[in-house]
Structure formats: structure tokens, C-alpha cells
């Protein structure tokens, strides 16, 4: 089934590239996407550095939330799905709750969220994700752990955001090399 999905995706992408009049400005900006990736990741890291200490001090748990299995999912055939799910998870579940923990960090968490939204928008505009039918087991484990831990889970998820950025970088580097 995986090869048939890949074949459908390739046929679709070939048709998109062959369509006349599709040479838009966004398509042209996508040719520069791999070169702008380090800058976008640096922006995420700088934005996270403004809240990192706050959340890591509040994180009283010894266990890791973002485990090696998530990185392996990012590097595997479900990489597109795992990345998409994790971005959505941080934007819809973690960051909205994290903003409410302290008025002094709300603006910085919001800024980090906006940068992550911009990153997601550029990914969607410039890269077609392969259709993934299965959910990433590692992402499901992260979501379940955060849900179980409640408030402590938000601190944990935010304190490990830099690991998430590293996993994004590993995924994007792998995709750029293929």
C-alpha cells in the first residue's frame, strides 16, 4: 500500500509541475526553502530561548517526553505525519496552555507559536507531504503522557521544545538530501 500511495503522489506532483502558468512567486520562493531552513530553525531556537529557563525550572520530572522513538518516526516513512502531528500538538494543545502559566512569558510563548505557525505554513506551501494513513505511535505516546501529567506535562513539553526543533532539523535535513 505504501508504494501505491507513493506512486499516486508522484503522479500528482508530476501533473502539478506540468501545469501551465503555475510558476508563481511562492513556487519560486520554494526553491530557496532549503537555504532558508537554518534561519527558520534559528528563529525557533531564539524564540524558545526566551521561555526555556522558565519551563525547565518548572519541569520537575526526570523522565524524557520526546524520546528517541519520536526521532525515529521523523526519520521513517511516517516522518511527514509525525512532524505534522507534533506541530499541531504544540500549537493547539501545549502552547495555549503554556501561555496561561505566567503573564510574563505569555508574549514570548505566543511569539514562539507564531514562528512555528509560519514554519508550518512554509512547509505546506513548499513541500507536499506524502499521504500517511497511520498515526505515529511515538506522537500518540507523547500526547498521552502530557495528558496524564496535566500541568506538569505542559512544563515538560515546553521544556523539551529545543529537542523538538532538533528533530525537525533532522527530518528536514534527511528530506533535503533525498
Curated annotation (Swiss-Prot):
InterPro entries per the UniProt record, alphabetical: 4_helix_cytokine-like_core, IL-10, IL-10/19/20/24/26, IL-10_CS
One Gene Ontology biological process: interleukin-10-mediated signaling pathway
GO MF annotation terms: cytokine activity; protein dimerization activity
SMART domains xref list: IL10 (SM00188)
Subcellular compartments: Secreted
Signal sequence range: 1-18
Chief location of this protein within or outside the cell: secreted
Cellular component per GO, a single term: extracellular space
Role description: Major immune regulatory cytokine that acts on many cells of the immune system where it has profound anti-inflammatory functions, limiting excessive tissue disruption caused by inflammation. Mechanistically, IL10 binds to its heterotetrameric receptor comprising IL10RA and IL10RB leading to JAK1 and STAT2-mediated phosphorylation of STAT3. In turn, STAT3 translocates to the nucleus where it drives expression of anti-inflammatory mediators.
Family statement: Belongs to the IL-10 family.
Name the record gives this protein: Interleukin-10
Organism: Callithrix jacchus
Gene: IL10
